[in-house]
Every structure is written in C-alpha cells, then in structure tokens.
Amino acid sequence: MPSVPLYFLTFLFGKNTPDHLLVKLYMLFGLLAIYRMMRDAGYDKASAAGLSLLCSFGSCLLALTLDGAVWYQAQLLAYMLTCLALLLMLRDHPTPALFLYALAVGCRPFNVLYGLLLYALYIDMARRDGQAWSTLLHRLILGTLLGLFVAAAYALYNYARFGNPLEFGHNYLPEFSTQGGTQFALWHIPANFKTFVLGLPFSEGMDGWTLNQFGFSFLLASPIFILLLVQCAADLCARRFTLLKGGLMLCFILHLLLLLMHRTFGGYQFGARYTCDMIPYAVLYLCLPGRRRSLRVWEWCLLAAAIGFCVYGTVSMAL
C-alpha cells in the first residue's frame, strides 16, 4: 500500500519522492483524526488536544517520523488510515470507514483485527439507535464489498510479485532472507514479553546508564496504553464494562500476542514500535461512554512526562 502514493508522487518528483515528509504527514493526519474523535465524544478542546498529542508526540510513534524508510511509511500510513476509519464509523459512515480499513490492512496485516471492532462498533451504535437489522446489514454491504475488492487486489498483486497471495515482502527482509529463523512462533513470546512488556528503558553498562536501543516496555514508550488499562480497570470496578469494551480489549490482547510472536519485534528502535499499531484501540476505548471528558491533573502530568521522554528518546536514537 505505501507504494501507491509513492507511485503517483514519482510523476512530480521522479526518484526523489518526499519520503521523510510523507511519514510526518501521516502522523499529523492521524493526530487530527484522533482530535476529532475526542471532540465528537465530548472532550473539551484542551483535553482532546492533549490526548491527541499523547498518541503522537508522547509515544514511540514520534521516532518513526524521522525516517522515511518504506516500513515506517507503511506503519504510519496504517495508523492514519485506521484512525480515519474509526472516525468515519463513529460518524455513521460505514462504507468509507470499511474501505479505509481495508487499505490499512495492506500496510499492517494484523490490523485486520480492527475489522471485527468496526463491525461491532457499528452494530452497537445502530441497535442503540433502534435501527432494524435489515437496514443495518444493508448499510454494511457496500463497504464490505469494497473491502473484499481491496483484499482481492492485494492478493493478486502479492501473487504476481512473490508467487504467494499472502506474502507481502516481509520474508525478503535481510534478517529473514539471509539470517534465517522462524519469523512468527510461539516460542518468541517469552523473550519479547520480558523486553516489550516488562522491560525498562535504561540499563547500566560500562559507560553508566544508557537508553536501551532494542526496545523496552510499550507501556512506558506509549503511555496512552496506561490510560487505557486504568480506564478499563475503573470500568470493571464500576460495572461499566460493556460487551463492546470487552470485545475491544480482547482484540487488543490478541493483537499484542500476535506481535509478540515476531522474532525481531522491530529490531533497533525507541520503545516498542510495533505496538504503535494498537494505539487506535486506546483512542476508541477512551471515546466510549463511561469516562470523564476532561483530563485529570495526573493525566496532564503523564502527558508532559511522556512528551519529554519521547522527545529525548527520539533525539538520542537519531544522534
């Protein structure tokens, strides 16, 4: 999918496409989509802006914007498309939402899990509004067909290029084509869990304390997930944990487990960049009913600390 906008840009820039600008624009449009979701959900302007900044400048997503490499383009484009899909679905536009979602899956295959969430979200909204099942299903048909068309196009392209409809080039990366090893396996989970769930950002070496450059806990790298878990716990305690919220958290956990099965989990990086794919789960959860629509003092403090740490980490990795 990232090659599509690049293809059209070649007519203007030739081989010198603005790769570094693209990754920044993808993050910016994702930020704006999150802001609109928060405002639509009833957050005040300051809190909506704060949460949007926490998802971008206060997460390991920030480090990805310094490099226009195609894998970073793919991840940020998927992030933007997924955020836009959620925004459109929340605004009762299922057809473009499902179309953008299908495009996002072409960038990050595990984003396919958001499809379950999009359908569940729309059904929940439609049924609460008293919409008949026949009307509901009718409104989902076109978007579903468009999504299937996009999936078929991806499959044909992959087959023509790699001889396999499910291969999108990942097995041709140097760490797999030359070093070998199993790309996805259950036995990768324990080591990845120790690093990317429990790992600390700093370690002590010969030169003192240094930033870990091959990953650390995704909760510290992107504290928006801390807000997600705190809100989830609050909903459980207050008995506000609905079926939709349960489905969202189930998709979140499954997505994380699938990522933890990856052998390299992103390699050299600030934080846990693969988990940036899961930020839209946190955004949607915080938009659902049951949460206060303004940030508390401790959440503002978390936001400030997160942005400061991520700016520091991003600069450190770039030097």
Set out the residue ranges of the language-model regions.
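Membrane-proximal envelope and lipid/glycan-remodeling enzymes
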Residues: M1-L319
